[in-house]
Each structure stands twice: as C-alpha cells, then as structure tokens.
C-alpha cells in the first residue's frame, strides 16, 4: 500500500505540473516534505497554498479515472443511517446515495480502501466512489450530522487541545500553526458557511476578549460562529497565506485574492486586511462568477424601465452613467451590461480598481496608483487601441471625466459610475467636477440610478390590505392602475433564517437626456427641476419603482422607505 501511494503521489505531482497548476520546484519540495511526513501529498500541497483543493481533486480524478462528486450528488438527508457519523468524519467519506445495486460514496482520499470496504460490508452491496474535496465532505458532515457541537466546535477543540500556540508575535510559530490541518479546516468552514448562507462579505474582527465573525447577508450584517480570541492571529495568518499576503507585515493594510471551490463551484474572494487596536481585521468579498447572467429581470428591471435602459446601452457612442452609493449593485449592473454588449464584432476594455469578475472576451485593466497607473492614464492609452466600448470603474475626478468625454466625442461608448443620490444629481456632479456644460450635454446619453432592497421570502410573506390613509400618504394611488391594495409583510421562517427576506433586487430610475433636459443643463438648472422634467417625460423614480415592487409582493414598503429616504 505504501509503495502504491508513493507511486500515485509522484504521478499526481507530475500531472499537476503538466497542467500548469503547480511548478516543478514546488512539486519537488512537496515530495521531499512528504517523504518525512505522515500527511498525504495532497494535504501538504493545499496546506502550503501551492495548489487549490479543487485542482488536486480534479487531478486525482483524472489520474485514477474516478468521477468527481457533483454538487447535485450531495444529499439533503443522511444516507445509510446505520453508519457512524464519527467514523465517516474521521475517514473523510460521505454516503451520497443508497441505490438498489450499489452505494455511492464521496471520498477525500480515494486510495484509502478501509472505509470503502467497511461500508460495503455494512450496506451489503458494492460501493462506487466519487472524489470530493475535504472541505466539501466536511461541510456536508456539518450540515447532515452537526449534532450538539457541530464541525466548528470539534475543530476548535482540536486546536485548543494541541500544544501551546505561542505568542502572537512569533511569526514562525504562527506560520506553522496556520498551516496545520485544524486551522485550515476552521477557515475553510468559515468561508463555506458564508457561501451556504448567500453572504456577500465576511468580516473577521478582533476585539479585546473575542474574535467576531460576521456575514453580510442581503445587505445586513449577521453574527456567525465565534472562534476563541486566542485563535485570532492563527485565523488571520491562515487567510493571509491563502491570499498570498505577507504574514509578517501587520502594520500596514494589505490586499489579495483567494480562489476556493465550495461544493464543486468556484468562488473568488477579495481579501483586505487592516491593523486595528487588538490585531488585524479582515474583510473578504465573495465573488461568484457563475452568478453573473445576461438577465436584467433578475436584477430588478421592470420591462418598461429595461427598454429605457437598453435604448441608452445600445447607442454607438456617448456616456452612460450608473449611479448610487457603495453597495448598491452598480458593478453588477455594469457587468451584466457588458455581457450583453460582448460580441465578436466589438472590442471592449474595462478600467477597474479592483477587477471583480473576469469576463472572457473583455480586455480588463487593473488600476495601480502606486506606479501612477491611474484611471485617466489607462484611458488615454486605451484610446490608441481602437476600442468600441470602454467601461471605467469610477469617474472619480476631473481628469478621468475629461478623458472619458474625449473618448465619447471620438466615437466610443463609455460606461461608468458615479456616487450620487439620484439620476438627476449626476449631471450636477459632473458640473461640480468643472466639466463644461456643453461637453456634458454633447456626450452624456443618460443616467441610471439604483439602490438595493431585500426581496421578501416567498415561503412566509404575509398579505395585508393597505389602509386608505397609507395609500394616500405613500403616493400609491397613481401607481395602482386597477391593482388591488394588497401589500406584504416580512414574517420569517427557516428558509430565510427568520429574517423574512431572501435575496436582493434593485429599485431603479433611468434618466435619458432629452433636448429639454439638455437645455436645463446648459442653463444650470437645479436638480429638482431636472428631475421634474424627466418625470414629465416618463421617468419613474426609484421610490415609485420600489412601490410597484411592494405592490407586486416582491418587497415591503418599509424596505423601499429604508433605501430611498434620502432621494
């Protein structure tokens, strides 16, 4: 068995090198470490951050000719209940399906025959294996067999029972601790729980006597598991190793990225650290490339609003602005727009800080202020590369606005964002940047403003009839058009974690620059006057769009008021 494993691990390392997932020197280093260790090669590779778990699992699958476990293979209820959860957990296996003629089993170590033979004996039938990552197996155990403590508590116990962790300023000891299996599993589990909860961000915050973990779900922060305070340095160090950051540098903020697979699906995590009074804090933004779809309806566009927006998006040249505060979904709207525009006939560039999603067929450029590679500098360069469409992550200053306007005047379509309260306010923001009014009216085709409201959970939302005084006070009557006066309240159930909401959608207003609005801009009219004329020309405000969504039962009036109160 030992010789079989050694031969397999050498073949596995060679396959990873041949596929470009591992360089040859790193492979030799890992094999040398393996010779004097009880750990498997795949454990060493992932522990050192040399290869992602999913890459190792896929290489094992190819090497052995054994299929990978698909996300749909993992059960919702325990399979083969006569099997001991403790045995399954220690063996890193999980029964997937009990079929009439065989047992389907997920395994993290396909060369370990003992649990396969034991379960075949217990089930009284042959076992067919599927390869899965250790994290996916552990997450499934947590979900199916959590018990009183669950996987999180057991991992913490393992770490607590280990040797003394040493002081937080012992970098070599921290590096070793962060590379030990229990800490790796703990951090992977924190990330996996966030993904399972549909979180957009993970916040790890050190305080004097505790380490807080919070997840932002549907725009609202919620408490997660609480690791012991003494683990804060180990947890942060593990994240920094995964993000390829310098674990010895704790005085300065650092930025990095992690790629991780959860239940067979790839996620990118944008990692930012910050030094605080009680240690380093970490924020991780979870980016799911597969969540980007060319479906504006999913984002919250109503058909008539979508038509107004697409009329602007399909213009051959000019500037289209998407505006709203941080976290209002502007970037998602722009990426969805690029998916629609991305055809073989068009050359598209983006200028971003940072690049959030990688888009095939789109040339994406990262801003690097430390070497003076700014938005404006990149834009000037791109104009020499014959683009059709340019997306600028943010029009944050006069210089960037000036070059964007030059691009629009020379026949390019420019998409960008601004931070303003509403669509009409974006025009005045450009004027405040000292952009000439005639250039604004000559280049800006339109502005879309948006905010995010939480979607009502369809499993537990509760209908009620709106009182006449509420209809008048909220301005609902002009929007009803024969609708009944049913509104819905958030209640809370297991499906939505007792919040009453599940998911988010945008409330939107689209302002097209008509001749009348251009005249107002040239006369430096106030924002209220521009908004009034835009509404007369058919623009529906974010507040009105939100009320329609409340009447549809998609959200609540309270949510609409929460996000539109300042517009």
Annotate each language-model stretch with its function.
Residues 1-280, 285-292, 296-297, 303-305, ...:
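N-terminal, intrinsically disordered, highly charged
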């Amino acid at each position: 068995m030992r010789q079989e494993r050694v031969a397999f691990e050498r073949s596995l390392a060679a396959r990873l090198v041949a596929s470009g997932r591992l360089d040859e020197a790193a492979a030799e280093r890992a094999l040398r470490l393996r010779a004097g260790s009880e750990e498997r090669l795949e454990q060493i590779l992932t522990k050192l951050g040399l290869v992602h778990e999913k890459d190792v699992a896929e290489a094992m699958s190819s090497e052995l000719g054994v299929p990978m476990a698909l996300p749909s293979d993992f059960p919702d209820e325990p399979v083969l209940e006569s099997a001991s959860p403790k045995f399954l957990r220690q063996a890193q296996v999980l029964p997937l399906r009990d079929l009439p003629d065989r047992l389907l089993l997920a395994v993290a170590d396909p060369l370990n025959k003992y649990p396969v033979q034991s379960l075949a004996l217990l089930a009284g039938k042959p076992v067919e294996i599927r390869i899965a990552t250790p994290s996916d197996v552990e997450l499934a155990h947590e979900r199916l067999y959590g018990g009183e403590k669950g996987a999180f508590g057991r991992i913490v116990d393992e770490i607590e029972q280990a040797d003394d962790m040493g002081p937080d300023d012992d970098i070599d000891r921290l590096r070793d601790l962060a590379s030990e299996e229990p800490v790796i599993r703990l951090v992977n589990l924190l990330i996996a729980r966030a993904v399972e909860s549909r979180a957009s961000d993970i916040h790890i915050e050190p305080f004097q006597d505790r380490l807080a973990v919070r997840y932002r779900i549907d725009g609202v922060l919620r408490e997660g598991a609480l690791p012991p305070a003494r683990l804060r340095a180990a947890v942060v160090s593990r994240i920094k190793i995964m993000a390829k950051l310098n674990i010895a540098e704790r005085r300065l903020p650092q930025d990095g990225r992690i790629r991780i697979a959860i239940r067979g699906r790839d996620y990118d995590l944008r990692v930012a650290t910050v030094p605080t009074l009680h240690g380093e804090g970490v924020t991780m933004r979870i980016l799911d490339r597969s969540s980007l779809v060319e479906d504006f309806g999913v984002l919250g566009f109503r058909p008539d609003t979508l038509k107004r927006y697409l009329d602007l998006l399909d213009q051959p040249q000019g500037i289209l602005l998407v505006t709203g505060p941080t976290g209002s979904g502007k970037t998602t709207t722009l990426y969805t727009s690029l998916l629609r525009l991305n055809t073989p006939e068009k050359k598209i560039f983006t200028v971003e800080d940072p690049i959030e999603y990688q888009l095939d067929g789109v040339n994406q450029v990262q801003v690097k202020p430390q070497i003076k590679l700014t938005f404006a500098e990149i834009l000037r360069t791109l104009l020499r590369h014959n683009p059709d469409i340019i997306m600028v992550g943010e029009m944050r200053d006069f210089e960037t606005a000036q070059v964007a306007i030059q691009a629009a005047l020379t026949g390019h379509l420019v998409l960008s964002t601004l931070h303003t309260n509403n669509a009409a306010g974006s025009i005045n923001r450009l004027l405040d940047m000292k952009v000439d009014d005639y250039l604004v009216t000559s280049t800006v085709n339109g502005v879309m403003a948006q905010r995010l409201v939480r979607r009502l959970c369809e499993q537990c939302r509760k209908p009620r009839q709106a009182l006449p005084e509420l209809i008048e006070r909220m301005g609902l009557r002009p929007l009803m058009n024969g609708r009944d006066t049913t509104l819905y309240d958030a209640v809370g159930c297991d499906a939505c974690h007792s919040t009453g909401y599940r998911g988010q959608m945008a409330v939107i207003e689209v302002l097209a620059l008509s001749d009348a609005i251009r005249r107002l801009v040239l006369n430096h009219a106030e924002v209220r006057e521009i908004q009034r004329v835009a509404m007369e020309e058919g623009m529906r405000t974010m507040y009105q769009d939100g009320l329609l969504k409340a009447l549809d039962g998609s959200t609540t009036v309270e949510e609409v008021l929460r996000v539109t109160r300042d517009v």
